[in-house]
């Protein structure tokens, strides 16, 4: 199931693509308009006409999946950070989940802090720059999802089914072990809990993937959804990306076989309070360099 994480990346933007790129003609216009609305280039790429060449040429690419914790007028912080690298030459994919409390330099801020604070300081542009600097790999594309509004997407597809391996209560919702059905509000609480989980941030990331995969499962039968308008509306309000519509379709066509050889990577480190009393996750230089080497090799980056 973890191999379907790419289908979340593509599917949350154009759920119809998941069914192999075939979708009903009568909703094409609505889907096209939605994908145009969610398109938001990075500031660094606004005058770069070659930004989409990697996808069209089927070269190795990287994607930053960013879940933003935005509530009301509060810009919030990045609730989750996941880097996906795809190499269509050997049909392989690597997924790296970055703990939100990772201590690193915040590019453009002139100081070090938790990596998820980059979003609060400078939005997706600063987040991309900070992740690039932390991993020492280029980030070609990003997909930003407002996790507060993600509940609307879950409700729009009729809720999702997940298998819960840890009984807990969060935000007034109780989650029993086993197979459970989640509404949008429940899904939001389900993906936010981490303090009761002995796996910490890694357990929370696992639950996020479960919910995302549940959305994709519903999206695979998009043409049968009576409320596809609600789905598109929720996506339009809560998703931003620098991928264009054509790039999404090229990616689905040219990179889908990467799912056949997928590797999930956890970043080793140690979490503890610093002298300022704040809890950080520290990644040893050697471990970070090993990760950098692995990703740069996968992306065929030589300089």
Curated annotation (Swiss-Prot):
Residue ranges annotated as Cytoplasmic topological domain: 1-4
GO BP terms: cell wall assembly
GO MF term list: phosphotransferase activity, for other substituted phosphate groups
EC number: 2.7.8.-
Membrane-protein topology: Single-pass type II membrane protein
Xref: InterPro entries: LytR/CpsA/Psr_CW_biosynth, LytR_CpsA_psr, TagU
Domain of life: Bacteria
Pathway: Cell wall biogenesis
Keyword line: Cell membrane, Cell wall biogenesis/degradation, Membrane, Signal-anchor, Transferase, Transmembrane, Transmembrane helix
GO cellular component term of the entry, any: plasma membrane
Subcellular localization: Cell membrane
Annotated transmembrane regions: 5-25
Extracellular side: 26-303
Pfam families linked to this entry: LytR_cpsA_psr
Predominant subcellular localization, coarse grouping: membrane
Leader peptide range in chain numbering: none
NCBIfam families associated with the record: lytR_cpsA_psr, PRK09379.1
Protein role: May catalyze the final step in cell wall teichoic acid biosynthesis, the transfer of the anionic cell wall polymers (APs) from their lipid-linked precursor to the cell wall peptidoglycan (PG).
Family: Belongs to the LytR/CpsA/Psr (LCP) family.
Entry protein name: Polyisoprenyl-teichoic acid--peptidoglycan teichoic acid transferase TagU
Organism: Bacillus anthracis
């Amino acid at each position: 199931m973890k191999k379907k994480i790419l289908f979340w990346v593509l599917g949350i933007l154009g759920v119809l693509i998941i069914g192999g790129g075939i979708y009903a003609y009568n909703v094409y216009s609505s889907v096209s308009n939605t994908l145009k609305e969610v398109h938001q280039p990075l500031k660094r790429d606004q005058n770069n006409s070659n930004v989409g060449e990697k996808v069209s040429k089927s070269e190795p690419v990287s994607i930053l999946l960013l879940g933003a914790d935005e509530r009301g007028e509060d810009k919030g912080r990045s609730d989750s950070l996941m880097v996906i690298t795809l190499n269509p030459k050997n049909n392989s994919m690597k997924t790296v989940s970055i703990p939100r409390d990772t201590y690193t330099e915040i590019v453009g801020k002139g100081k070090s802090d938790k990596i998820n604070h980059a979003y609060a300081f400078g939005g997706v542009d600063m987040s991309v720059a900070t992740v690039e600097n932390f991993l020492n790999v280029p980030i070609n594309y990003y997909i930003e999802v407002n996790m507060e509004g993600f509940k609307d997407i879950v409700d729009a597809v009729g809720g999702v089914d997940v298998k819960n391996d840890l009984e807990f209560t969060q935000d007034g919702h109780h989650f029993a072990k086993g197979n459970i059905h989640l509404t949008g509000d429940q899904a939001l609480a389900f993906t936010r809990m981490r303090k009761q989980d002995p796996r910490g941030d890694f357990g929370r990331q696992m639950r996020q993937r479960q919910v995302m995969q549940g959305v994709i499962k519903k999206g695979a039968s998009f043409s049968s959804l009576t409320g596809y308008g609600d789905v598109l509306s929720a996506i339009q309000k809560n998703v931003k990306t620098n991928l264009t519509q054509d790039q999404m379709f090229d990616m689905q066509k040219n990179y889908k076989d990467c799912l056949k050889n997928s590797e999930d990577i956890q970043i080793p480190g140690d979490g503890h309070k610093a002298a300022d009393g704040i809890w950080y996750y520290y990644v040893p230089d050697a471990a970070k360099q090993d990760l950098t080497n692995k990703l740069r090799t996968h992306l065929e980056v030589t300089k």
